[in-house]
Regions:
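Short, mixed-charge low-complexity intrinsically disordered segments
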Residues: 61-100
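Short aromatic-glycine-(Arg/Gly/Cys) micro-motifs in beta-strand/loop hairpins
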Residues: 17-33
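Short, intrinsically disordered, low-complexity terminal segments
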Residues: 9, 51, 85-86
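A short, charged, amphipathic alpha-helix used as a generic interaction element across diverse proteins
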Residues: 46-63
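A short, exposed loop/beta-hairpin motif centered on an aromatic-Gly-Thr core
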Residues: 31-46
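Short N-terminal "domain-start" leader segments
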Residues: 1-21, 94-99
């Protein structure tokens, strides 16, 4: 064994809230504030490079082989006329010890 710790993996999610795309890393079992980045705009959707740069600024990087998955939700549950909300998620790993 090399003595190096394996980086912990987390889920990063991205959605539009309060008029801007926000990327955040979900830290479970902690009272710490989740690391978050606001892109400052509702459109266009942040590019892959912008998302990777935001993760890096938060101390994370995409996990090897991870891909972004997009899910559709609604603002008002059980209301078919409600506006659509897009949520993206991917696996990330900490390279700064965040969430430890």
């Amino acid at each position: 064994m090399s003595g190096q710790e394996t980086p912990r993996e987390f889920t990063a999610q991205m959605s539009v809230r309060a008029g801007c795309w926000r990327l955040y890393v979900v830290l479970l079992n902690t009272t710490e504030r989740w690391p978050e980045h606001c892109f400052g705009r509702p459109l266009p959707v942040p590019t892959f490079t912008e998302r990777a740069d935001a993760l890096k600024a938060l101390g994370f990087e995409p996990a090897p082989g991870a891909e972004w998955a997009w899910t559709e939700d609604t603002e008002k549950p059980d209301d078919p006329a409600s506006a659509v909300v897009l949520i993206a998620a991917t696996r990330v790993r900490s390279w700064t010890g965040a969430g430890q």
